[in-house]
Amino acid sequence: MNITFIGFGEAGGILAQDLQAQGNAVTVWDRKALVAETLPALQQKAQQGRVRLAASLADALQDATLVFSTVTASQALNVVQQAAALLQNGQHFLDLNSVAPHTKRAAAEVIHAAGASYIDVAVMAPVPPKRLATPLLIGGAQAERVKPLLHQLGLNSRLLGSEVGEASAIKMCRSVMIKGLEALTTECLSAARQYGVEQAVLDSLHASFPSLGWNDQLPHYLISRVAEHGQRRAEEMQEVVKTLQDVKVPADMSAAIVATQQGLVDALNARALRYQQLTPFIWQETLDKIYPPQ
């Protein structure tokens, strides 16, 4: 099967590599190819994954049966508008980006007007651990037709129905909790560390929620997700804010999550720290670089 990925970051890179390993013809396109400074690393990544790096978006979309969009939330609609002028009848555009239902519906209108089909896809867990087995929710007028193709590829998809936006709504509402827990942990332990009471706080959390791992790897994992992906998560949470506002639900917590996720990234950038310099990730050491112990 001819498959194209627009966006060759973490999720797109993993899925593209695994699908290529199955014998599919996988092509990738990323706007980093347009920047001289980032092109060599992109070429190396494509070579390592044994996928074809397209010369242009038009080149990437030609002859593709399935087109997966795995860009950032802020670029999701721009990609739709650029791709729509190049898509043809019979092609399926699968939008895996974490954006508001309203954004997905607007994207669907653009793709449908171009004659292609639009599939709303919600990625319901981090991609690295389960890779192709990562749970996906799919919806859209052609979702029932596309599901067998995804099953053939080994993707773990669940059909919701023909309505665009339902899968996205589930993902957006879930993100309030998931990204919120990351932000709460970052803020909580940043302060606790400054007061020298972090172990007592973690002991108390473990006593209240003994099955979650507060006394083990959970704090490292939650804060590492912000350190590594806070920029993208902040953009996604801005879409969550829109999701809530569209149905007149106050988005105070979601707006605060945006600030906390982005805040940690900004603090690391201000100190010229990159996530690769922080691995293996130990939350205490990372926060000490931002907030020197009192």
Q: What do these predicted regions represent?
A:
Residues 170-279:
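Helical "substrate-binding/catalytic lid" subdomain
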Residues 6, 29, 69-70, 121:
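The conserved SAM/SAH-binding core of class I Rossmann-like methyltransferase domains
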Residues 99, 105-179:
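Rossmann-fold dinucleotide-binding core
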Residues 26, 53, 117-118, 157, ...:
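Hydrophobic beta-strand scaffold residues
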Residues 57-118:
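Rossmann-fold NAD(P) dinucleotide-binding segment
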Residues 1-62, 87-90:
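NAD(P)+-binding Rossmann beta1-loop-alpha1 motif at the extreme N-terminus of oxidoreductases
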